[in-house]
Amino acid sequence: LFWVENGILFFEYKPDVILNLNVAKKVVADRIRFQNEKSYPVLCDIRGIIDTDKSGRDYLAHSGSMLTKAVGLIVHQKVSITISNFYLHVSKPTVPTRLFTSKEDAIDFLKQYQ
């Protein structure tokens, strides 16, 4: 689910998603098509992801950054935060990327990239 509000692109994963390479490629292709060649700061709610694999994470860290100015990831569990922090340090996304448990904090971070 994608929408733009106040210059920020919002994206929410559906519940119980297993993020593998095929899912990552589809999500990125759908987002790029939705954006119609315009770059945005992106708020991505990943609370619906229940599992990932390395190829999916790597794809998002690199190809998933196309047409993004910065990314705020919304997480809700300590396990998600730990895994996501590990992802940020190992995969090294190509745009500024931070984790948040609060949507408002993520929006504040992304406003500087509008």
Task: Mark where each language-model region is.
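Amphipathic, Lys/Arg-enriched alpha-helical "gate/interface" segment within cytosolic domains
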Residues: 1-114
